Protein backbone atom coordinates (compact mmCIF):
# COMPACT_ATOMS: atom_id res chain seq x y z
CA UNK A 1 0.00 0.00 0.00
CA UNK A 2 1.11 3.54 -0.75
CA UNK A 3 1.80 4.81 2.77
CA UNK A 4 1.83 8.46 1.65
CA UNK A 5 -1.15 9.00 -0.68
CA UNK A 6 -1.71 12.38 -2.29
CA UNK A 7 -4.91 14.28 -1.53
CA UNK A 8 -6.28 16.61 -4.19
CA UNK A 9 -8.23 19.20 -2.20
CA UNK A 10 -10.53 21.26 -4.42
CA UNK A 11 -12.09 24.60 -3.48
CA UNK A 12 -14.86 26.21 -5.53
CA UNK A 13 -15.29 29.97 -5.24
CA UNK A 14 -17.47 32.80 -6.46
CA UNK A 15 -17.31 36.24 -4.86
CA UNK A 16 -15.88 34.59 -1.75
CA UNK A 17 -13.55 37.31 -0.48
CA UNK A 18 -15.16 37.21 2.98
CA UNK A 19 -14.32 33.58 3.68
CA UNK A 20 -11.74 32.32 1.21
CA UNK A 21 -8.56 33.16 3.10
CA UNK A 22 -9.44 31.00 6.10
CA UNK A 23 -10.15 28.07 3.78
CA UNK A 24 -6.83 28.47 1.96
CA UNK A 25 -4.87 28.80 5.21
CA UNK A 26 -6.47 25.66 6.65
CA UNK A 27 -5.14 23.70 3.67
CA UNK A 28 -1.73 25.32 3.38
CA UNK A 29 -1.08 24.90 7.12
CA UNK A 30 -1.47 21.12 7.02
CA UNK A 31 1.44 19.17 8.49
CA UNK A 32 1.03 16.43 5.87
CA UNK A 33 3.08 17.21 2.73
CA UNK A 34 1.32 15.33 -0.08
CA UNK A 35 -1.50 17.73 -0.85
CA UNK A 36 -2.42 19.06 -4.28
CA UNK A 37 -4.51 22.19 -3.79
CA UNK A 38 -6.80 23.27 -6.64
CA UNK A 39 -9.04 26.34 -6.77
CA UNK A 40 -11.81 26.86 -9.30
CA UNK A 41 -13.26 30.36 -9.39
CA UNK A 42 -16.33 31.34 -11.38
CA UNK A 43 -15.03 34.72 -12.59
CA UNK A 44 -15.55 36.52 -9.29
CA UNK A 45 -16.15 40.27 -9.34
CA UNK A 46 -14.79 40.95 -5.85
CA UNK A 47 -11.27 40.40 -4.45
CA UNK A 48 -11.40 36.59 -4.60
CA UNK A 49 -8.79 36.34 -7.37
CA UNK A 50 -6.50 38.76 -5.54
CA UNK A 51 -6.62 36.48 -2.50
CA UNK A 52 -5.87 33.42 -4.63
CA UNK A 53 -2.87 35.17 -6.18
CA UNK A 54 -1.60 36.08 -2.72
CA UNK A 55 -1.24 32.37 -1.92
CA UNK A 56 -0.42 31.18 -5.43
CA UNK A 57 2.90 29.60 -4.42
CA UNK A 58 1.06 26.99 -2.35
CA UNK A 59 -1.61 26.26 -4.96
CA UNK A 60 -1.03 23.51 -7.53
CA UNK A 61 -3.43 24.99 -10.06
CA UNK A 62 -6.26 27.49 -10.27
CA UNK A 63 -8.54 28.99 -12.86
CA UNK A 64 -10.99 31.89 -12.90
CA UNK A 65 -13.58 31.76 -15.64
CA UNK A 66 -17.36 31.68 -16.03
CA UNK A 67 -19.01 28.34 -15.34
CA UNK A 68 -22.45 26.80 -15.66
CA UNK A 69 -22.98 26.50 -11.93
CA UNK A 70 -21.44 24.91 -8.85
CA UNK A 71 -21.33 21.35 -10.13
CA UNK A 72 -19.85 22.36 -13.47
CA UNK A 73 -17.08 24.09 -11.50
CA UNK A 74 -16.59 20.98 -9.36
CA UNK A 75 -16.22 18.91 -12.52
CA UNK A 76 -13.47 21.27 -13.68
CA UNK A 77 -11.69 20.59 -10.41
CA UNK A 78 -12.02 16.83 -10.83
CA UNK A 79 -10.51 17.04 -14.31
CA UNK A 80 -7.48 18.94 -12.99
CA UNK A 81 -6.89 16.62 -10.03
CA UNK A 82 -4.02 14.11 -10.17
CA UNK A 83 -3.92 12.85 -6.56
CA UNK A 84 -4.92 9.47 -5.16
CA UNK A 85 -7.93 11.06 -3.46
CA UNK A 86 -10.28 13.97 -4.22
CA UNK A 87 -11.74 16.08 -1.44
CA UNK A 88 -13.99 19.13 -1.82
CA UNK A 89 -13.64 21.99 0.62
CA UNK A 90 -15.48 25.09 -0.48
CA UNK A 91 -14.96 28.72 0.47
CA UNK A 92 -15.76 29.19 4.15
CA UNK A 93 -15.20 25.53 4.98
CA UNK A 94 -11.95 24.52 6.67
CA UNK A 95 -10.04 21.41 7.62
CA UNK A 96 -10.67 20.73 11.31
CA UNK A 97 -7.08 21.11 12.55
CA UNK A 98 -3.61 21.57 11.06
CA UNK A 99 -2.90 17.85 11.43
CA UNK A 100 -6.20 16.56 10.05
CA UNK A 101 -4.73 15.00 6.89
CA UNK A 102 -1.80 13.57 8.87
CA UNK A 103 -4.26 11.92 11.26
CA UNK A 104 -6.26 10.47 8.37
CA UNK A 105 -3.11 8.90 6.94
CA UNK A 106 -2.17 7.56 10.39
CA UNK A 107 -5.58 5.89 10.60
CA UNK A 108 -4.76 3.98 7.40
CA UNK A 109 -1.50 2.46 8.67
CA UNK A 110 -2.94 -0.99 9.37
CA UNK A 111 -4.76 -1.20 6.05
CA UNK A 112 -3.47 -3.72 3.50
CA UNK A 113 -4.62 -1.47 0.67
CA UNK A 114 -5.95 2.06 0.41
CA UNK A 115 -9.70 2.39 0.96
CA UNK A 116 -11.88 3.64 -1.87
CA UNK A 117 -13.80 6.05 0.35
CA UNK A 118 -12.69 7.75 3.57
CA UNK A 119 -15.14 9.60 5.79
CA UNK A 120 -15.57 11.21 9.18
CA UNK A 121 -17.47 13.74 11.26
CA UNK A 122 -18.22 17.42 10.67
CA UNK A 123 -18.41 20.47 12.91
CA UNK A 124 -20.70 23.34 11.92
CA UNK A 125 -19.41 26.93 12.03
CA UNK A 126 -20.97 30.33 11.42
CA UNK A 127 -19.80 33.07 9.07
CA UNK A 128 -17.17 34.17 11.59
CA UNK A 129 -15.82 30.65 11.98
CA UNK A 130 -17.35 30.18 15.44
CA UNK A 131 -18.44 26.66 16.34
CA UNK A 132 -22.17 25.92 16.30
CA UNK A 133 -21.59 22.36 17.45
CA UNK A 134 -21.42 19.05 15.66
CA UNK A 135 -23.50 18.28 12.60
CA UNK A 136 -26.93 16.95 13.55
CA UNK A 137 -26.56 13.83 11.41
CA UNK A 138 -23.75 11.71 12.81
CA UNK A 139 -21.68 9.65 10.39
CA UNK A 140 -22.66 5.97 10.73
CA UNK A 141 -20.15 3.49 12.10
CA UNK A 142 -20.53 1.47 8.91
CA UNK A 143 -21.34 3.27 5.68
CA UNK A 144 -22.73 1.83 2.45
CA UNK A 145 -24.44 3.52 -0.46
CA UNK A 146 -27.76 2.29 0.90
CA UNK A 147 -27.14 4.25 4.09
CA UNK A 148 -28.02 7.37 2.10
CA UNK A 149 -31.67 6.40 2.06
CA UNK A 150 -31.67 8.21 5.42
CA UNK A 151 -30.33 11.39 3.83
CA UNK A 152 -26.88 12.93 3.50
CA UNK A 153 -25.45 11.01 6.47
CA UNK A 154 -21.91 12.18 5.77
CA UNK A 155 -21.27 15.82 5.00
CA UNK A 156 -19.73 16.27 1.56
CA UNK A 157 -16.81 18.15 3.15
CA UNK A 158 -15.95 15.05 5.22
CA UNK A 159 -16.30 12.57 2.36
CA UNK A 160 -13.10 11.69 0.48
CA UNK A 161 -13.10 9.47 -2.61
CA UNK A 162 -10.36 7.77 -4.55
CA UNK A 163 -9.98 9.75 -7.73
CA UNK A 164 -10.07 6.66 -9.93
CA UNK A 165 -13.63 5.79 -8.86
CA UNK A 166 -15.02 9.34 -8.65
CA UNK A 167 -17.44 10.19 -11.46
CA UNK A 168 -18.19 13.66 -12.74
CA UNK A 169 -21.11 15.40 -11.07
CA UNK A 170 -24.48 15.15 -12.77
CA UNK A 171 -25.13 18.77 -13.72
CA UNK A 172 -28.80 18.03 -14.39
CA UNK A 173 -29.21 18.37 -10.63
CA UNK A 174 -29.10 21.96 -9.42
CA UNK A 175 -28.93 21.32 -5.66
CA UNK A 176 -28.28 17.65 -4.93
CA UNK A 177 -25.59 16.46 -7.35
CA UNK A 178 -23.31 16.01 -4.32
CA UNK A 179 -25.80 13.54 -2.81
CA UNK A 180 -25.92 11.63 -6.11
CA UNK A 181 -22.10 11.76 -6.40
CA UNK A 182 -21.50 10.29 -2.95
CA UNK A 183 -23.90 7.44 -3.69
CA UNK A 184 -22.11 6.71 -6.97
CA UNK A 185 -18.71 6.70 -5.23
CA UNK A 186 -19.99 4.31 -2.56
CA UNK A 187 -21.56 2.01 -5.15
CA UNK A 188 -18.15 1.72 -6.84
CA UNK A 189 -16.32 1.15 -3.54
CA UNK A 190 -15.04 -2.14 -2.16
CA UNK A 191 -13.28 -0.68 0.88
CA UNK A 192 -14.83 2.11 2.96
CA UNK A 193 -12.93 3.57 5.91
CA UNK A 194 -14.43 5.37 8.90
CA UNK A 195 -11.68 7.53 10.39
CA UNK A 196 -13.79 8.29 13.49
CA UNK A 197 -12.24 11.75 13.30
CA UNK A 198 -13.70 15.22 12.83
CA UNK A 199 -12.45 16.10 9.35
CA UNK A 200 -13.95 19.48 8.51
CA UNK A 201 -15.64 22.65 9.69
CA UNK A 202 -18.66 23.30 7.48
CA UNK A 203 -19.95 26.84 6.98
CA UNK A 204 -23.67 26.85 7.71
CA UNK A 205 -25.27 29.30 5.30
CA UNK A 206 -28.74 27.78 5.20
CA UNK A 207 -31.14 27.27 2.31
CA UNK A 208 -34.04 29.54 1.46
CA UNK A 209 -37.44 27.90 1.86
CA UNK A 210 -37.76 27.77 -1.94
CA UNK A 211 -34.38 26.07 -2.37
CA UNK A 212 -35.11 23.70 0.50
CA UNK A 213 -38.25 22.46 -1.23
CA UNK A 214 -36.41 22.14 -4.55
CA UNK A 215 -33.57 20.27 -2.83
CA UNK A 216 -35.96 17.79 -1.22
CA UNK A 217 -37.65 17.22 -4.59
CA UNK A 218 -34.31 16.54 -6.27
CA UNK A 219 -33.20 14.27 -3.45
CA UNK A 220 -36.40 12.27 -3.85
CA UNK A 221 -35.59 11.87 -7.56
CA UNK A 222 -32.11 10.57 -6.70
CA UNK A 223 -33.54 8.15 -4.14
CA UNK A 224 -35.99 6.82 -6.71
CA UNK A 225 -33.18 6.39 -9.25
CA UNK A 226 -31.28 4.11 -6.88
CA UNK A 227 -34.41 2.49 -5.40
CA UNK A 228 -33.41 3.84 -1.98
CA UNK A 229 -37.05 4.14 -0.97
CA UNK A 230 -37.45 0.38 -1.12
CA UNK A 231 -34.20 -1.04 0.20
CA UNK A 232 -32.26 -1.46 3.42
CA UNK A 233 -28.68 -1.94 4.53
CA UNK A 234 -29.58 -5.51 5.43
CA UNK A 235 -30.00 -6.25 1.74
CA UNK A 236 -26.41 -5.21 1.19
CA UNK A 237 -24.89 -7.71 3.63
Task: Walk through the language-model features, giving the residues of each.
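Glycine-rich, basic loop-to-helix element that forms the pyrophosphate-binding segment
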Residues: 65-81
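N-proximal low-complexity "stem/linker" segments adjacent to membrane-targeting elements
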Residues: 1-26
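A conserved acidic beta->alpha catalytic loop
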Residues: 41-49, 90
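Conserved nucleotide-sugar donor-binding catalytic segment
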Residues: 120, 134-218, 222
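Conserved donor NDP-sugar-binding/catalytic core segment of glycosyltransferases
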Residues: 98-132
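Conserved small/polar residues in nucleotide/adenosyl-binding loops
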Residues: 230-237
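Short, acidic, metal-binding catalytic loop of nucleotide-sugar glycosyltransferases
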Residues: 26-34
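Short aromatic/hydrophobic "clamp" motif used to bind/position activated sugar donors
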Residues: 86
Amino acid sequence: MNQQPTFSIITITYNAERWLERTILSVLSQSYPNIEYILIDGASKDKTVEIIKQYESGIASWISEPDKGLYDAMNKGLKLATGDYVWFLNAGDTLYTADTVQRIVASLKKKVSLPDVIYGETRIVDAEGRSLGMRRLKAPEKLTWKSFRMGMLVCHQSFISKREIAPLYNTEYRLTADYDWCIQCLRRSKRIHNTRLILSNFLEEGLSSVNRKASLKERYEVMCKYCLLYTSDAADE
